[in-house]
């Protein structure tokens, strides 16, 4: 989800880069913040979007599931007083922190931030040795729990679907053999095994562990489910004329956002396998191009922007539809609750 997946963000000299909001101008153009408007930033992070929205005169409710981000954002809370509210929460719960039908805009920047990648103790990066954690908050199941406890069949599904890893069976079986001798504890521990069983080829542009680390992070934080629930919640929270803007960095996430807006356009759909559904009242209309990506100039300055895609929709007066997760066709993956038992 980042320019150097699993490996941290670096500048030309190899040092960590400061967090730069991706597609900021495009986000603001789609969101149209202005005095008197109430915007929810579902992924506060380092506050890049929130700062720009506040500068445009709007009021902001910002959410983040990472307590580190909440602590770092207290200076912004003090600086902006009543115009800015910062809440420790997953963005799938945005309805708990905003008036139903009262928001003028919602912006979601999906994925792990460069700051989280650069903190070795968070366990997101295989290039920085640390505990095999990957949780965006301190709660729930860690990546080590998944690797050491999940059935081989579940590991294969997780790596294949969430990481699009073609060597998923080989890696999963190697994990099973190794954990029987000694459990996995660190990022380098797991990355080393993956590199051993699937060595990098000359033509490979990424580290062999990249896709597995991505899959584990998405699974541990239920990132796809969180995104889907956030889209449904935003639909109910936005007033007519309100704007929903989502920035994604991975094909799976973009597919979810694209499917959501396509479904909410209200057009009839069907296939040779399914009956044609009748047209429904659209709850969202398109804003500008169906998808916006970063310019070469931005990607050169901020490599993380290279894979970014922005999609946006304008809320209509039609009533919000039911939150039906079957819309996205998620496979049946292992239960986080059982792994954490």
UniProtKB/Swiss-Prot annotation:
NCBIfam families: 16S rRNA (cytosine(1402)-N(4))-methyltransferase RsmH. It is found in: Cytoplasm. S-adenosyl-L-methionine binds at residues 47-49, 64, 91, 109, 116. One of its GO terms (cellular component) is cytoplasm. One of its GO terms (molecular function) is rRNA (cytosine-N4-)-methyltransferase activity. Its main location: cytoplasm. Pfam families: Methyltransf_5. It is an enzyme of class 2 (transferase). Transmembrane segments: none annotated. Its EC number is 2.1.1.199. Keywords: Cytoplasm, Methyltransferase, rRNA processing, S-adenosyl-L-methionine, Transferase. It catalyses: cytidine(1402) in 16S rRNA + S-adenosyl-L-methionine = N(4)-methylcytidine(1402) in 16S rRNA + S-adenosyl-L-homocysteine + H(+). Belongs to the methyltransferase superfamily. RsmH family. InterPro entries: RsmH, SAM-dep_MeTrfase_MraW_recog, SAM-dependent_MTases_sf. Specifically methylates the N4 position of cytidine in position 1402 (C1402) of 16S rRNA. GO terms for biological process: rRNA base methylation. This is Ribosomal RNA small subunit methyltransferase H.
